[in-house]
Amino acid sequence: MSNPILSWRRVRALCVKETRQIVRDPSSWLIAVVIPLLLLFIFGYGINLDSSKLRVGILLEQRSEAALDFTHTMTGSPYIDATISDNRQELIAKMQAGKIRGLVVIPVDFAEQMERANATAPIQVITDGSEPNTANFVQGYVEGIWQIWQMQRAEDNGQTFEPLIDVQTRYWFNPAAISQHFIIPGAVTIIMTVIGAILTSLVVAREWERGTMEALLSTEITRTELLLCKLIPYYFLGMLAMLLCMLVSVFILGVPYRGSLLILFFISSLFLLSTLGMGLLISTITRNQFNAAQVALNAAFLPSIMLSGFIFQIDSMPAVIRAVTYIIPARYFVSTLQSLFLAGNIPVVLVVNVLFLIASAVMFIGLTWLKTKRRLD
């Protein structure tokens, strides 16, 4: 009788064997449980793009009543940690040393300029351009404080201050503009990419190193059954890691979740199959655990960080690099998680990402199936 292409009896037996190996192997639990939580806490508490307290120097070249009043408004802001001095060289030295990130210069003719009709703002703001993000914060905060001070001054003088432009900002999807709320979904993607790739990158390589692959290939097992028994147990282990990441993100880190849990489960499964397939492909090619781990880290971690849109906007990349991002599964999972966490179920985003993730999973698992041979080389 011919050997069937797929026997679920053999698949079940091999999955039981693989599960027992996982239970007995502490490294699998370290990779699937400890490392995701550790990385998530590092991303959640260690990376913060919000500047809540900026160190700014105030150069007082004039100590008039108006200059001191504006300085008092600056120092009263909860966003400014001010260093006041009348010595320009001292403040410049502190800025060069990184002790302050910006410098507000109140010139010697500050009061006289303020008394003139239609006078322009007689202050100078110098920022540290080596950190553009912080420099933009300094500029924005100082401009905001300057406008508030002008309004208060006009009210005290019985006048009405009307700015030329009245900007009313609304932050959709992230009303408080908290950076962790979009960092954490991206961090979960990076973590699941690395975990999924590493978990399976060691599987086939370990079989070759221990000499058990020869025993497996000497049986009636088919390529499809071999791949299934390697994918199924690690799929459940990966979904456990995903569940832990979600619980920590929502209940400990406080990131809101507005999407469907069923959609999250479905898309997470597709993404995990892509990363597990990538790891299996690496393991099948290298046949060495050390080499497989190194290749998995480089093939999974670096592209998912650099080319997924997590840190750098894909639209701002050169056309050649943008083309490369289409084969990076993390690209589609980052936007999916950010959408589900912050905006909810947006079909125009989710449907496209699902299609690309299906194609990615089929590609990696298909390549692994082609590279898996039923003979010893």
Curated annotation (Swiss-Prot):
A GO MF label: efflux transmembrane transporter activity
Membrane topology classification: Multi-pass membrane protein
Pfam family, one: ABC2_membrane_3
Keyword Transmembrane recorded: yes
Any one of the GO CC terms: ATP-binding cassette (ABC) transporter complex, substrate-binding subunit-containing
Family matches, as Gene3D superfamilies: abc type-2 transporter like domain
Compartment(s) of residence: Cell inner membrane
Domain named ABC transmembrane type-2: residues: 145-375
Source taxon at top rank: Bacteria
Protein keywords: Cell inner membrane, Cell membrane, Membrane, Transmembrane, Transmembrane helix, Transport
Stretches in topological domain Periplasmic: 50-181, 256-261, 313-345
Major location (coarse): membrane
Residue intervals on the Cytoplasmic side: 1-28, 203-234, 283-291, 367-377
Entry's transmembrane regions: 29-49, 182-202, 235-255, 262-282, 292-312, 346-366
GO biological process, one term: xenobiotic transmembrane transport
Induction and repression of expression: Repressed by the transcriptional regulator CecR.
Homology family: Belongs to the ABC-2 integral membrane protein family.
Protein purpose: Part of the ABC transporter complex YbhFSR that could be involved in efflux of cefoperazone. Probably involved in the translocation of the substrate across the membrane.
Known partners and oligomeric status: The complex is probably composed of two ATP-binding proteins (YbhF) and two transmembrane proteins (YbhR and YbhS).
Protein name as catalogued: Probable multidrug ABC transporter permease YbhS
Organism: Escherichia coli (strain K12)
